[in-house]
Amino acid sequence: MKRLFFVLFASMALAFGASAQTAEEIVARMDKETEKGDTQGLAMTMSMKIPIVGEFSTRIKARGDYSKAESTVKGEKVIFWSDTKTTWTYTANNNELVIEPSKGSQNDEGELVKGITSGYDVSIKGETADAWQIKCVKQKSNQDKDDPKTMDLVVSKKTYLPVRLVAKVKMVTVTLSNFALGVSPEEVKFDQSAYKDAKVIDKR
């Protein structure tokens, strides 16, 4: 009987050990999943909490070199579109469309989650039935002054996509959430015919 219990216990221990994953393995799998956004498109919500100014959120969609961001700040709705050459900014309150050359050569919105834990030590601080809670601590070798000292990351056990990432940069708390794969080109490409009545300011 004792031998039977020992065999059962050993089998359970082996099974648990085989299924357990380290924080590094979870993050590596997460990076692999978010890379699919290059071809499938990736959407997320970025919320910022700023002292005095308050809190506002932006819904971001990106696919390849194209991106679209919609934000409402103090009742004013603003929509941004961009590709490698041009940026369009539409302000709903005054029905104004500003067209400018893009400042970057790539889709910055799509890069928000790529290698986001690079330069950080990661460890599992807890888990639920649905997700892992991972603590990210900035490495001493990371000399980027803009990188926060710590980040709190939650990763879905089902999809391996981030569920939420919270970081504090100086006095600003930034939260990335509501991640989803699957964005069509039509969702992110600017269609000027939809804004033919807007006042256009072309700065190209």
Residue ranges: model-predicted function:
Residues 40-46, 130-137:
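A short hydrophobic beta-strand element
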Residues 38-39, 60-68, 81-87, 128, ...:
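Short, solvent-exposed coil/turn segments at beta-strand boundaries
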Residues 57-59, 77-79, 121-123, 150-154, ...:
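Short, surface-exposed charged micro-motifs
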Residues 5, 16-57, 61-65, 194-204:
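N-terminal leader/targeting segments and the immediate start of mature chains
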Residues 94-95, 101-129:
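Flexible, surface-exposed loop/linker segments and immediately adjacent secondary-structure boundaries
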